[in-house]
Amino acid sequence: MNIKLRFPRSSLAIAILSVVAFLVLIALTAFFLVHFYSEYLWYDQLGFTGVIVTQWAAIFVVFCLAFVFVSIFLWLCMFSAHKFRPRYTSLSSVLSHYQKVIDPIRKIVVLLVSLGLGAVAGIFAASRWDIVLAWLNKVPTGKSDPIFHNDISFYFFDLPFYRRLLFFLLVTFVLGGILSILISVVYGALRVDGKEIWLSKGARVQYAVLAAGIFVLLGLEFWLNRFDTLLSDRSGLITGAAYVEVNALIPGFAVLALVALGVALLFCITAFTSRWRLPIIGVALAVVSALVVITALPWGVQRFHVDPNARVLESEYIKRNIESTRFAYGIDKTHEVLYSAKTDVKPGQLRNDARTTASIRILDPGLVSRAFGQLQQFRQYYTFGDDLSVDRYHLGGETRDAVVALRELSLSGLGSGNTWVNQALVYTHGYGLVAAYGNDRTPDGEPKFFESGIPTTGLLGKYEPRIYFGRKSPPYSIVGAPSGAAPFEFDYPSSSGGESYTTFKGSGGPKLDSFLKRLIYAMKFGSEQILLSSQVGDYSQILYDRDPIKRVGKVAPWLRLDRNPYPSVVDGRIVWIVDGYTTSDQFPYSDLNSFTTLSQDSQSLPALVNGSDSINYIRNSVKATVDAYSGQVKLYAWDPNDPILKVWEKVFPGTLHPIKEISGDLMSHVRYPLELFNIQRQILARYHVTDPGVFFSHEDAWGIPIDPQKSEPVMQSTGQRRSRTVFSVAQPPYYLTMRMPGQNLAAYSIYSVFIPKSTGENSRSVLTGYLSANSDAGNIPGQISPDYGKLTLLRLSKDQTVPGPGQIQNAFDSDPKVGNQLNILRQGGQTRVLPGNLLTLPVGGGFLYVQPVYVQSTGSTSYTLLQKVLAAFGNKIAFESTLNQALDSLFAGNSGASNSGTSDISIHPPPHSDLIAQIKAALREKVDALTNKDLVKYAQADSKLNELLSRYLDANRG
């Protein structure tokens, strides 16, 4: 007997939709569980559980408050609109039809609409949990604004919170009004009959109360607008309240606030009198008042009173802007020195600057990456960054500038061996720091390394060389092995066809000590192998989120991070040093700018900032370190007096370490942040002027010279309010150990130059100023050098004409002798000539320019070699094989400088130097064969090179 079950089509559709909805619900639940649990495990392992729990708690509480308030408010609006409907009234056929359709499901629709809009409101409110926490934990700054005399903390913490709260309430009231009108129309409480509008009594009361609430909120909005004038750039002249704002807009906004409150009162009266004429007149009056106060009055005052006397009337407000901007950007204590620069040359002119000239960095970190790769990569699964870092080390009794890089892991180099086992379990880390003298080279033009090789040898002593956490680390690795088991993580190549293995020891990531955790991470990374692999067990740890910037950003979400972390060997370990900034766009009278635009130079990484990119206050409040082996993150309160830092210390107690815990070794590697210096030099280009009259006329505005090596604009994205593209070719600043004029000792500092800000035919690339920031924090544990961070500005006399970087580069490019030698270096197109960084140095009573010149063959495996040095002083230039020769050529055969470009440190000769020579020869044979497209010789040279490298590694290992 066959029994056939038949389901109505509607029931089948409901069943299918129910199953789909259930599956979607399960998937969403699983997604959130995986995300939240894995995040908790990550923070817990690092010891920052309080950070994520506080975030989640704040998000949850803010969401719930907003959700409950909006849901109840909107439900009450719709419920009241229905409750106050007329009981007996004739409706049109259309409205009657709508009532019949809606009535059966009215309650559920009202509930769903209320809950849905409440959820949206909750998400909106919770997205800025940071504003709420900052407001709840605010601290005074001790500094007040010049108009209202409010503490600056009011603008940092109170005003953003009040602004967002008002916007939230205003939108809620407007939504409540719209929904109430819809219900009233459907149920006849609001009818339009020809020219007449009819309202039921209940609807009249409800609309009047809602309108009164809206105008109360608008009144508060106008009142807050008074304070916003101190933060706006409406005048087009400065950020902050200028003459028109102080004398017209601020009083006008106060009047508008009173008008709005008066209109609200009229609506309240209407709720009881049913007379709409007065509130309608009030609304019209409010609109006219707003047009007059916001548009007509400021225009009239500006046009007929300010413009004819602008220089005098705006002087007071320009002065406030100058003082506030210089303080907010940390340039108010810049030490200015009038520098009378010489342009003539004479023998022995650099004798008093011998220490500086001996330290001139001729190694360009932006050009030697390929040389580091070809000479120190050793295997295809290692890599170096494109732009290397500049650091300094104490070697042989003195501090030497160095170009450094980490030999990081590159999974793309595995080729066909790029399996899951190799990706996740075997190739887990890079190996070793490579460092070369900044002021030296080999006779062949290669970097002169003082720390290199595998295993690492050199002058830095013994340290942990393995790099599990870096800029190029794999998305995730699983490390660890059972006690006594043979290690299976690849460590480094050790012999011909052989490899050395290791096992990670320590705590670097969440433990996979349960089936649930392995399931969670299998789902997170979309890899079932995490569950199935026999090499993953209770002993395993999973390492992920390994980029030092990302790690610091997660444990300190309130920080803005510098995009230029750099590695250093500190206390026997490799650590990444990351600079963190506290910023705000709420400092009264301070110039408002885009962080991304100000911090860009021709070598900056592209940055797309989510949310507001605006700033008018910045402090380098935190120095962070990330251990390259364990991934441990430490945050140090570098500027404990910063009020924003104090707030976040209250929000996340116990996450910041005091300065006293910084070791002497770490202190010696701390430097002045690159992006902060970029921002400050851009601000100082305009705000070196402190006289309001000169500032108003723009007669002494400066600019940053373009990078002479960049012929094409570098396109970058900004995130200020709306994403846009900017073009940045600003010459990058440079780190160097040098003695500035007027100083007794040389100091590791960062430098940049200024030229006049002009465009078109009137542009002049002559020097107007030279800026330095002391980057030497000293080496005393827990104590910052008093000179660290000191800004020094050499201001040139206006009657002097000293060539700027652009003019010097043009002189280099157009000099016939230099051109002839460059043509020889190009070898008929077989090699490329690459100019290095153009350094400007205030020595010899003037300015010395130095530029290394590199050559690179056209082969794919070629790398840059430093072959020549260009130098210039005044209008004289030299082009020689060494810096010393170039300086002597400039200064009539005797510069008086020491042996620049050579090292007097006793360096242990590399073991088996004959092998090194053979390796270099084989490498050149390989490059030449590839250039000539001789595949047979290329294969032979490659085989020979691998054999020699294996012998060298064996010799070092032994």
From Swiss-Prot:
Pfam families: UPF0182
GO terms for cellular component: extracellular region; plasma membrane
Sequence intervals crossing the membrane: 14-34, 59-79, 107-127, 166-186, 205-225, 249-269, 280-300
Location relative to the cell: Cell membrane
Subcellular location, principal: membrane
Membrane topology, from the record: Multi-pass membrane protein
Keywords noted in UniProt: Cell membrane, Membrane, Transmembrane, Transmembrane helix
Keyword Acyltransferase: no
InterPro entries: UPF0182
PANTHER family in alphabetical order: UPF0182 PROTEIN SLL1060 (PTHR39344:SF1)
Protein name: UPF0182 protein TW644
